[in-house]
């Protein structure tokens, strides 16, 4: 997956640096900046970039104990096989020599074959004499390394990629690479005296500006943060230029998408009515089809009611024109601190981001950055840490796999995995689990003051005999209820709560809440094992891979509606 534009640790040599509850609990976490034998890195590591299927991860590290023979004293690039548990160093010359300079700012092609990275090393390719940080591509199958930050004529760049903005990205087939550079000699006629975003074609050898307008004119101000869809057709970038589209009148940094096949450029950091942002926008990432783009923005006018005065994360739908705020809690509460570094799943459903806000999930008391995942379908937001643990150090810069199941990030926390004693920033991957169980929506408050929450234990599965227990508590004692389920979410108002499932609905047999004898209190609970329904074959729609949305309904005769509802749960049926 294409990474967000990340502040990586480096390109520096070691000598230059000073020595929701159920959903969260279902997460498993692994520290990946370790050796093939599990030895933890003895220095800082960057956030990982992940392949689409979560098989491979790439990161850079100053650690010298991740592979044998690491004696160059510089940051190197490592690829971790998450399935086999092996780690290899890939920022080496084709003859196996260690690089003689620091390497970083890495990303993987979506299938893991190609690694693109930046390096100050001069011994990775022949003829590297510019003494600059260059961009390279490694083919992990052939072992070949190309330098791609060159002109169409093969001339070396006369300036660097900058460590804080240049995270090069490569298409799946390895043909196209986008990167940022301050060089003036990569394209003829480079006259803006500023940073530009570039596209290099590894088949034809051509290098051109990404930041051109439809008429072919170069951007008249700084452009950075280029990213690319896996097919190489669409690029997204950030620019201060005013000449990329007509009527760019806000005088601020915006996010743009360019169709590289047609040359058409679109300003996407706008409201649903097309209003340009009244604050800077930055760090865009596209879904593979180019439809959805997520980005960060300080603007207050992209959605109605943006009143928190903080940098937020937004998603713009290029098909419908709709822009939505996604750095919010499950109930829509806006963050009380900065959010950013957003990445998006391939279907546009899941957006991961980091935030210092304390209002996005309950009990966020660590006063530092965390990584969150927002589900645009269910509107639920959860904190990504693994096992529900709150990190005791900053956690940031997420990456995401195609379906949103696995989330990578870096963290300085020491309590995310056992045995974290290296006092370094490490790279982690959280697996949310195949079932992807998550709560969403809002429960009604009962006449007795109960707010029933739905939860689960076990896994929804067609095979075996293990249960998948669904439970709503607290509910009013001694009342009958039932579980409704369907295959899409919905949120029309239902008195004090929400009916969270779209029609058509199926209903289970009644269940009894039990609890104390009258009068009414909140001692009841509704429980149902869903797996016998799945395995019975009565509902032909309950097949492996199907996502189910469910919610408990129960009697509450003293309420205005005569009934109450829990919040809702979504899960995917497993084989």
Predicted regions, residues:
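Conserved "turn/edge" positions that cap or connect secondary-structure elements
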Residues: 24-434
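Bacterial N-terminal signal peptides that target proteins for export
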Residues: 2-11
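Residue-level hotspots within well-ordered secondary structure
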Residues: 434-575
């Amino acid at each position: 997956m294409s990474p967000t534009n990340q502040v990586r640790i480096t390109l520096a040599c070691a000598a230059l640096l000073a020595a929701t509850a159920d959903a969260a609990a279902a997460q498993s976490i692994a520290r990946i900046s370790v050796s093939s034998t599990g030895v933890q890195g003895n220095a800082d590591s960057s956030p990982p970039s992940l392949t689409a299927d979560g098989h491979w991860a790439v990161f850079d590290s100053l650690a010298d104990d991740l592979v044998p023979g690491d004696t160059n004293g510089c940051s190197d690039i490592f690829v971790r096989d998450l399935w086999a548990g092996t780690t290899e160093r890939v920022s080496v010359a084709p003859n196996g020599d260690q690089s003689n300079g620091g390497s970083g700012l890495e990303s993987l092609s979506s299938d893991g074959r190609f690694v693109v990275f930046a390096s100050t090393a001069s011994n990775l390719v022949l003829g590297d004499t510019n003494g600059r940080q260059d961009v390279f591509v490694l083919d992990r199958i052939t072992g070949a390394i190309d330098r791609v930050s060159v002109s169409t004529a093969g001339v070396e760049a006369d300036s660097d990629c900058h460590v804080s903005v240049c995270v090069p990205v490569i298409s799946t087939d390895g043909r196209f690479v986008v990167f940022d550079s301050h060089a003036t000699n990569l394209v003829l006629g480079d006259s803006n005296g500023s940073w530009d975003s570039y596209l290099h074609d590894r088949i034809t050898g051509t290098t051109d500006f990404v930041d051109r307008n439809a008429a072919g004119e170069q951007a008249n101000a700084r452009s950075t943060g280029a990213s690319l869809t896996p097919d190489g057709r669409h690029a997204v970038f950030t620019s201060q230029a005013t000449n990329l589209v007509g009527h760019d009148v806000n005088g601020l940094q915006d996010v743009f998408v360019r169709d590289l096949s047609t040359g058409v450029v679109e300003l996407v950091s706008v409201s649903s009515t097309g209003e340009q942002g009244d604050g800077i926008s930055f760090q865009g990432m596209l879904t593979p089809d180019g439809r959805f783009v997520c980005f960060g923005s300080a603007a207050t006018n992209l959605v109605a009611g943006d009143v928190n005065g903080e940098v937020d994360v937004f998603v713009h739908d290029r098909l419908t024109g709709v822009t939505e705020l996604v750095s919010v809690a499950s109930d829509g509460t806006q963050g009380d601190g900065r959010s950013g570094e957003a990445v998006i799943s391939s279907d546009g459903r899941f957006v991961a981001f980091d935030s210092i806000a304390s209002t996005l999930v309950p009990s966020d008391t660590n006063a530092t950055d965390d990584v969150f995942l927002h589900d645009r379908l269910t509107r639920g937001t959860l904190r990504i840490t693994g096992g529900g643990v709150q990190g005791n150090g900053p956690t940031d810069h997420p990456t995401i796999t195609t379906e949103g199941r696995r989330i990578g990030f870096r963290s300085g926390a020491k309590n995310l995995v056992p045995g974290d004693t290296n006092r370094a920033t490490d790279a982690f991957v959280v697996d949310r689990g195949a079932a992807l169980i998550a709560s969403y929506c809002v429960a009604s408050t009962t006449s007795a003051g109960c707010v029933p929450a739905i939860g689960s234990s076990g896994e929804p599965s067609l095979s075996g005999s293990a249960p998948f227990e669904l439970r709503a508590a607290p509910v009013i004692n001694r009342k009958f209820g039932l579980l409704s389920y369907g295959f899409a979410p919905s949120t029309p108002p239902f008195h004090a709560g929400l009916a969270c499932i779209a029609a058509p609905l199926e209903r289970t047999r009644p269940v009894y809440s039990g609890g104390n004898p009258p009068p009414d209190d909140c001692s009841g609970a509704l429980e149902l094992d869903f797996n016998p329904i799945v395995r019975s074959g009565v509902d032909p729609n309950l097949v492996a891979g199907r996502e189910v949305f469910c919610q408990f309904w129960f009697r509450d005769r003293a309420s205005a509606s005569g009934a109450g509802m829990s919040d809702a749960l979504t899960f995917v049926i497993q084989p």
